[in-house]
Amino acid sequence: MTYRPLLNDLVDMAAGRAPVDLVVRNARIVDVFSQRIVEAPLAIGGGRFLGFFEAEAHATLDAEGRYLLPGLIDGHVHIESSLVSPAQFARLVLARGTTAVIADPHEIANVCGLAGLRYMLDATRDLPLDVRLALPSCVPATPFENAGAVLDAAALATLMDDPRVAGLGEMMNFPGVLAGDADVLDKIALALDRGKTVDGHSPGLAGRDLATYAAARIATDHECTTVDEMHERIALGMYVLLREGSAARDMARLAPGITPGNARRCVFCTDDRQPADILRDGHIDNHLRIAVSHGVDPVTAVTIATLNAAECFGLRDRGAVAPGRVADFVLVDDLTGFAVRKVYAAGRLVARDGAVVVDLPDHADPAVRDTVNIRPLDDTAFRLPLPTGLARVIGLQPHSLLTDALERDVPRDASGCFTPGDGLVKLAVVERHKATGNVGVGIIEGYGLRGGAVATTVAHDSHNIVVAGDNDADMLVAVRELERTGGGITLCAGGRVLASLPLPVAGLMSDRPATEVSATFAQMLSIAHETLHISRDIEPFMTLSFLTLPVIPALKLTDRGLFDVRTFSFTTVGV
């Protein structure tokens, strides 16, 4: 932005030569700089905080003794994973006190390339939610799958100078970093040369490998699942983004690792969170509740949720209640439950008691529709011949993106093909961008599905079709339903569709209101658990969507076959 026209107004209002826009009285203001509570009037004008003083004002607000926090910031989120459009996502999180997010749109980029990134910039431009993009670093995530696009450093350079671009998105290709891969380092330099942040992704890295990764000036990691991992990264100068999503829930394990000495290197993030979870449990406000319940000082927790995130990603005019900063703030009842009563963005009321009170413009773009393009399949598409009964199996872990690499004696039919049973379910990935006909087939344990199939076009990160089932016929019905709807999530049994949630925007997002999407999703969850018997320890759809991501250990499945993340190479299902 250009500050000069704004400065005259700010200085005149702060100096008393002009009325301010708003004075907030009777608030307990959380001062994240001095780690204290301030009780003083707060003057706001021109969408900015002016200072702690009384002033002639166009309007006043009685906070009635509530706590006033800076607007909450999500340090790493994939908006597409909310299954709704950016405007509908904003409606969900603004109501919970989140006023800024660092969004990595690598989901839509893997489907639509630069057109998807431009859509995300255009769709968020006029929202009261401040959306900064971290340009996807790994499209495709690896060279071991087929995505809808390839984005090299030259492609990213066309958008990196946009002021709403915070930097480079999570560098999932940590083997490429360690090996000094030229394309990887070119992308990192693209952000660093502009003084922007490089976001990280380094599950399981430790010791010299982690130090090498950090030496590449990668600033963050949101893949920590233990306190030891968290502390090792902080000791290397990295920020740790403590994640509480829908499938990956790490806060309870990591919050005890927050100390007075390391708290300023912590940030909160959701990564992937679905509408029902946001509506029920909240967004970054949920992180605050969890942190405090695990003994973190409330003001420290607020600092993590605001100032730390702002400083990590270069949002220099946000993250604190201080003169000159954007007047994003939240009124909450107390510093334990953090019940959000009012939310202001740039000095304007945007949400009250859980409801957004301003119009949020939606954005339509034909470039991100009609994205399901598959070669016709027949009833042999999902056959899995095995040389013996011993097979490599993907073992699911409750509430985690990690999987186990298992070996199991599996049932086979007379022709030597795997037949689901004994707690084992068939998994397939169908390429859906260029109609290559690629179909990868594997076996999972711990999903619990019986009597049907589940399929979705949300399949990180290349977003091919992933389908799980205990019979090939229902798996085929499910894939054809996704082709019909232009993408989405579907449940099938007995040769018919039980329920579907169409996601026509890139096969990732709905064009319907968030409440409608949430209601449909809740109905489908019920069917998944009760009719198809999927384990209640598993989030059926998001868990399925991560079984295709070949950068999180240990075994994953792509459209090209079974992939061992530990060795970064393909392996066979048969042992």
Curated annotation (Swiss-Prot):
The keyword Nucleus does not apply. It is an enzyme of class 3 (hydrolase). Its EC number is 3.5.4.2. SUPFAM superfamilies: Composite domain of metallo-dependent hydrolases, Metallo-dependent hydrolases. It catalyses: adenine + H2O + H(+) = hypoxanthine + NH4(+). GO terms for molecular function: adenine deaminase activity. GO terms for biological process: adenine catabolic process. HAMAP family: Adenine_deamin. Belongs to the metallo-dependent hydrolases superfamily. Adenine deaminase family. This is Adenine deaminase. It comes from Nitratidesulfovibrio vulgaris (strain ATCC 29579 / DSM 644 / CCUG 34227 / NCIMB 8303 / VKM B-1760 / Hildenborough).
